[in-house]
Regions:
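C-terminal helical cap/extension that packs against the catalytic core
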Residues: 2-5, 45-104
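Short active-site-adjacent structural elements
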Residues: 13, 40-41, 64-66, 93-95, ...
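Active-site-adjacent alpha-helix immediately C-terminal to a catalytic or transition-state-stabilizing loop
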Residues: 115-125
Length: 125
């Protein structure tokens, strides 16, 4: 399993991610996404839809403006992406790694989410 972390969160980032995914060797890509309600969620997800096998949504921890994982999954479904919710990024990674061990996993949708993932995975000193 390979996983990537990207802070992209707007339509231009969605298009850039889609363009990059289109150039990569064939492999299922599963997205873990959390976003803020101040962003264009559909505009971000729509370009990516053709390049991902599934979307797992999370609510960004400790962010008052976070889109709920349920609402984010609904937008994913409206973009024709098979979508499910997870309690957090760790649970999403565990689930995807068990079900799709050879997959590419992209965590994206917010700089706040990216920061959270990086803080959670800092080596202890």
């Amino acid at each position: 399993m390979r996983f990537w972390l990207d802070g992209g969160h707007n339509p231009a980032a969605g298009r850039a991610i889609a363009a990059t995914l289109a150039t990569l060797p064939k492999r299922d890509t599963h997205i873990i996404c959390g976003m803020l309600n101040t962003k264009d969620v559909t505009g971000f997800l729509a370009p990516i839809a053709a390049h991902c096998a599934s979307l797992t949504t999370v609510t960004i921890p400790n962010e008052v403006n976070a889109v709920s994982s349920a609402d984010l999954a609904e937008v994913g479904r409206s973009c024709a992406i098979p979508s499910r919710e997870a309690s957090d990024v760790h649970a999403a990674l565990q689930d995807l790694s068990q079900r799709h061990p050879q997959a590419r996993i992209l965590i994206c949708g917010s700089l706040y989410l990216a920061g959270h993932v990086l803080r959670e995975n800092e080596p202890s000193t």
